[in-house]
């Protein structure tokens, strides 16, 4: 992971933390284990915050299951902002 991806990850984690209330370091550890399942309301708020933060559209699956894949989000954002 290069510096741009790492910085993007930390911004994504910050946005997720603002919704879930979980500590950023704990979220990073959670995402090392795989995607994080959240309820529908949190999912939509996380997607909205991340899209607003990076001024982009993530085209996330809005039908569920409501899993947050931090690495996939970072990949989408870095490809959009090349």
UniProtKB/Swiss-Prot annotation:
Task: Return the EC number.
Answer: 1.14.14.13
Q: Which UniProt keywords apply?
A: Antibiotic biosynthesis, Flavoprotein, FMN, Oxidoreductase
Name its pathway: Antibiotic biosynthesis; butirosin biosynthesis
Class in the EC hierarchy, top level: oxidoreductase
Give one Pfam family, short name only.
Answer: DUF6137
Q: What is one Gene Ontology biological process annotated in the Swiss-Prot or TrEMBL record?
A: protein homotetramerization
Catalytic activity of the protein: 4-(gamma-L-glutamylamino)butanoyl-[BtrI ACP] + FMNH2 + O2 = 4-(gamma-L-glutamylamino)-(2S)-2-hydroxybutanoyl-[BtrI ACP] + FMN + H2O + H(+)
Q: Which domain of life is it from?
A: Bacteria
Q: In the record, what terms sit under GO molecular function?
A: oxidoreductase activity, acting on paired donors, with incorporation or reduction of molecular oxygen, reduced flavin or flavoprotein as one donor, and incorporation of one atom of oxygen
**Which InterPro entries is this protein grouped with?**
DUF6137
- How does this chain assemble? Homotetramer.
Q: What does this protein do?
A: NAD(P)H:FMN oxidoreductase component of a two-component system involved in the biosynthesis of the side chain of the aminoglycoside antibiotics in the biosynthetic pathway of butirosin. Together with BtrO, mediates hydroxylation of gamma-L-Glu-GABA-S-BtrI.
Q: What is the official name of this protein in its record?
A: 4-(gamma-L-glutamylamino)butanoyl-[BtrI acyl-carrier protein] monooxygenase BtrO
| Natural source organism | Niallia circulans
User: In the record, what lineage is assigned to the organism producing the protein?
Assistant: Bacteria, Bacillati, Bacillota, Bacilli, Bacillales
- Gene encoding this polypeptide? btrV
């Amino acid at each position: 992971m290069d510096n741009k991806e790492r910085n993007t990850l930390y911004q994504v984690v910050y946005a997720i933390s603002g919704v879930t209330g979980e500590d950023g370091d704990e979220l990073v550890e959670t995402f090392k284990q795989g995607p994080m399942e959240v309820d529908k309301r949190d999912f939509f708020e996380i997607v909205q915050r991340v899209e607003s933060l990076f001024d982009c559209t993530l085209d996330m699956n809005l039908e569920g299951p409501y899993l947050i894949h931090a690495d996939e989000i970072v990949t989408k954002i870095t490809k959009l902002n090349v």
